[in-house]
């Protein structure tokens, strides 16, 4: 259990000036008492009623602040028993704010970077519903203004009173209806179901925006209370881009689909311009987008120019159109009509503005899985987009990386650019594993120059680029025998910044290697093989096979190696701990399903069988695995895989399926990458569903599921009904339901019990 609960390497956040870093320690598995806190499940959101924040929002228990120039520590007085959100830096990097979650609410704190002095803002209670921590570019409870003194915060409204009580007598029946218009939707969880649910959602999600003067601690209300999805100052800070949900709500869709008003305000909350009054998005095509404006933002390097995207195909990816989306812009004072800046042939997937009026735009073709990076000129409406990169989304070897950004004085993130050159940073996937890199790339010539790449045999991840040339980096270095630590790299020169001790000396001697092979039809595959410490060559061990299937358009991309498991430090995740109990572990086993994206699942079972057969054959050929003592296990779609392998093969002696979906007729509008509905491809849904073959599962299977699963499609009833089907047909099966746990298990006691259950199961059926 010591290895299971060993602390992970701290995460890092670098200041906007790139001169300080905060190393943030997370608890790998918090206590079950955290997981079991009271919550409401409303509109697809899990709300902690004690804190008025997100239930089980990630938190840090400590920060360590370092000056990057000399590595000196800055002592900071943080709250006792802290549960801190991520730091939110002022644009000058002299201060950072953070929330601290207490049993009674979310506090707001601020620290001075150079001195470590901290203060709590008394009387400020943050509303953490509909937010994701902090930082510009995403929903946040905290937004710094460029004066580095003022913040916009979302507060629990003062004097709002107690939460609405469930009426003792129902007001009437709960009614839903649809009047003949198609509206397919995934099987979302945690939706609204009654008028009382609506009242509770309004109560907890409603926030009061306010300006907070960090010098005095005084708050000034901004506008009226509302359910805000967005508040973002313009670069010149004369305007605020806001989004606000309103009724009528849906009982079939989560909050992100509710009606929404997108407006520009002045600094006093007076509406200046309405971008869109979006209706309920209840008729969005499968894999489509809602019509009307979306992806709205400010253009980073302009004073106050809006940009947003609109679909030209009705949001339907099946429509044949010359252009699928258009990008519009509108400058203050927002008079006249918006300008159509550019059109893209495929679905818009993101934009980063450059410093010359141009922008990098990504679009994605659903039919071919091709993702492109385009250069467009926002200052020349109607000009043709120029293709910079184009590749299959699964083609990791050709991934050019992402543009590196830095923080401007306005607090906005912008692409680092010197003339025509930008910096790109990526995973660097290769046949030997990931080798992260930084490139200097010329947009005019299309030529790149490699500035840095992680050496083979180890793993050096790029955590931050510390200068505009890309030569000074903050990296995290590790190897199978080297504990992860942070370094400052300046070209070839390395300076160690942290000295974290080995948290898991128990893993010393565990061997691991990347293994490459092919399946029967020639598709290249791989897995990472773990062998116990002291393993003697030629000894055949009982083995555990852990995998998760993915879909690919072609064999070349299906066979690519991704990840850095074989080069990284051997800390071991929970599913890998069998190697400490005498098992060989075949980890991250390739399970590709290859074919046309529209019909790839027609041969799902056949390909899955070939994948598993090839992996076992290779391990047996190497002389390390006993063919007659192999177990298979996986989580979510990996659990689905496990049940299918036990239903359709005799390759395994036992299986463990965590939080799976086994009857695909209960996810009738598509699942994973399946694009067809049940009514279009009922035979495929049936053939892929192990529930329909429960009578064939005679290999012992342990099924585990969180009672509060929140993942689309994997309702707990999937495991409950699968257990009943196998039991009813005379199979050997055990069902373990985990109280309070969601799709991904979090609680310390939960993880210890899961490990106990799985090791006992495999020991019983795989060991002599």
Model-derived features: where do they sit?
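Short beta-strand element of the alpha/beta-hydrolase
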Residues: 531, 539-550
């Amino acid at each position: 259990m010591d290895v299971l609960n060993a602390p992970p390497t701290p995460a890092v956040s670098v200041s906007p000036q790139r001169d300080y870093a905060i190393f943030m320690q997370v608890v790998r598995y918090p206590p079950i008492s955290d997981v079991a806190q009271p919550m409401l499940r409303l509109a697809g959101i899990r709300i902690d009623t004690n804190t008025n924040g997100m239930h089980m929002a990630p938190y840090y228990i400590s920060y360590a602040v370092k000056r990057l120039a000399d590595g000196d520590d800055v002592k900071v007085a943080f709250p006792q028993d802290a549960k801190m959100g991520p730091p939110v830096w002022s644009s000058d990097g002299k201060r950072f704010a953070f929330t601290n979650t207490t049993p009674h609410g979310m506090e707001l704190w601020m620290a001075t970077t150079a001195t470590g002095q901290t203060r709590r803002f008394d009387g400020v209670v943050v509303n953490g519903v509909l937010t994701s921590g902090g930082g510009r570019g995403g929903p946040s409870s905290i937004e710094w203004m460029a004066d580095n003194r003022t913040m916009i915060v979302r507060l629990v409204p003062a004097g709002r009173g107690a939460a609405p009580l469930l009426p003792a007598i129902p007001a009437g029946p709960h009614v839903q209806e649809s009047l003949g218009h198609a509206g397919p939707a995934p099987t979302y969880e945690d939706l609204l179901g009654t008028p009382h649910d609506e009242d509770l959602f309004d109560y907890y999600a409603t926030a009061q925006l306010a300006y907070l003067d960090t010098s005095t601690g005084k708050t000034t209300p901004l506008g009226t209370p509302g359910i805000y999805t967005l508040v973002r100052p313009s670069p010149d800070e004369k305007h605020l881009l806001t989004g606000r949900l309103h009724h009528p709500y849906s009982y079939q869709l989560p909050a992100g689909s509710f009606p929404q008003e997108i407006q520009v305000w002045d600094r006093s909350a007076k509406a200046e311009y309405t971008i869109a009054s979006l209706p309920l998005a209840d008729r969005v095509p499968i894999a489509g987008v809602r019509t009307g404006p979306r992806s709205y933002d400010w253009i980073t390097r302009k004073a106050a120019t809006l940009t947003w995207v609109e679909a030209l195909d009705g949001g339907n990816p099946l429509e044949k159109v010359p252009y699928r989306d258009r990008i519009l812009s509108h400058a203050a004072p927002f008079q006249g009509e918006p300008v159509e800046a550019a059109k893209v042939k495929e679905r818009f997937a993101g934009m980063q503005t450059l410093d010359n009026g141009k922008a990098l735009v990504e679009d994605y073709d659903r039919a071919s899985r091709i993702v492109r990076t385009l250069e467009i000129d926002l200052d020349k409406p109607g000009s043709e987009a120029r293709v910079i990169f184009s590749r299959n989304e699964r083609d990791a070897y050709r991934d050019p990386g992402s543009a590196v950004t830095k923080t401007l004085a306005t607090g906005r993130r912008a692409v680092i650019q010197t003339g025509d050159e930008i910096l790109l940073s990526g995973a660097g996937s290769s046949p030997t594993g990931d080798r992260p890199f930084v490139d200097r790339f010329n947009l005019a010539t299309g030529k790149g120059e490699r500035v840095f790449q992680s050496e083979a045999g180890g793993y050096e991840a790029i955590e931050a680029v510390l200068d505009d040339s890309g030569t000074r980096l903050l990296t995290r270095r590790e190897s199978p025998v080297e504990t992860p630590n942070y370094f400052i790299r300046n070209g070839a020169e390395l300076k160690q910044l942290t000295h974290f001790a080995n948290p898991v000396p128990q893993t010393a001697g565990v061997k691991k290697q990347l293994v490459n092979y092919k399946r029967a039809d020639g598709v290249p595959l791989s897995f990472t093989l773990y062998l116990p410490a002291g393993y003697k060559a030629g000894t055949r061990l009982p083995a555990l096979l852990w995998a998760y299937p993915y879909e690919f358009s072609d064999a070349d991309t299906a066979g690519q190696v991704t990840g850095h498991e074989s080069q990284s430090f051997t800390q071991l995740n929970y599913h890998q701990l069998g190697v400490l109990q005498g098992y060989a572990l075949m980890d991250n086993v390739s399970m590709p399903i290859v074919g046309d994206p529209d019909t790839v699942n027609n041969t799902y079972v056949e390909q899955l069988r070939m994948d598993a057969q090839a992996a076992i054959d290779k391990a047996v050929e190497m002389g390390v695995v006993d063919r007659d003592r192999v177990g298979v296990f996986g989580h979510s779609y990996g659990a689905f895989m496990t049940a299918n392998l036990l239903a359709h093969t005799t390759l395994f002696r036992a299986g463990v399926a965590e939080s799976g979906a086994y009857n695909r007729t209960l996810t009738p509008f598509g699942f994973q990458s399946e694009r067809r509905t049940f009514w279009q491809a009922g035979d495929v849904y049936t053939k892929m569903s192990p529930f329909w073959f429960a009578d064939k599962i005679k290999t012992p299977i342990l099924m585990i599921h969180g009672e509060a699963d929140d993942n689309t499609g994997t309702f707990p009833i999937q495991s409950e009904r699968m257990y009943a089907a196998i039991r009813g047909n005379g199979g050997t099966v055990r069902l373990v339901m985990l109280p309070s746990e969601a799709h991904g298990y979090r609680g310390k006691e939960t993880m210890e019990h899961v490990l106990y259950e799985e090791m006992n199961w495999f020991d019983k059926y795989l060991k002599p």
